[in-house]
């Protein structure tokens, strides 16, 4: 499975303890998302299109309506980066 650079960046943030907060509109559809690092910074690269691709591939999951986190499949797909401390420049 090929993963784009943006998707890889989002998966790496989630692997380091980040989460994706979501809001729903009138119906069941998710209208806005915010990718937050474990330090509370917001990742600007994460938009609704990237979120939809990650969710469709089952790389992220939400449990009991909580924030989206990395699934076991997503954890296996994350490529290691030289930045192991989790310092992301936003």
Swiss-Prot record:
InterPro entries: YjhX_toxin. It comes from the Bacteria. HAMAP family: UPF0386 (MF_00827). Belongs to the UPF0386 family. This is UPF0386 protein Rru_A2144.
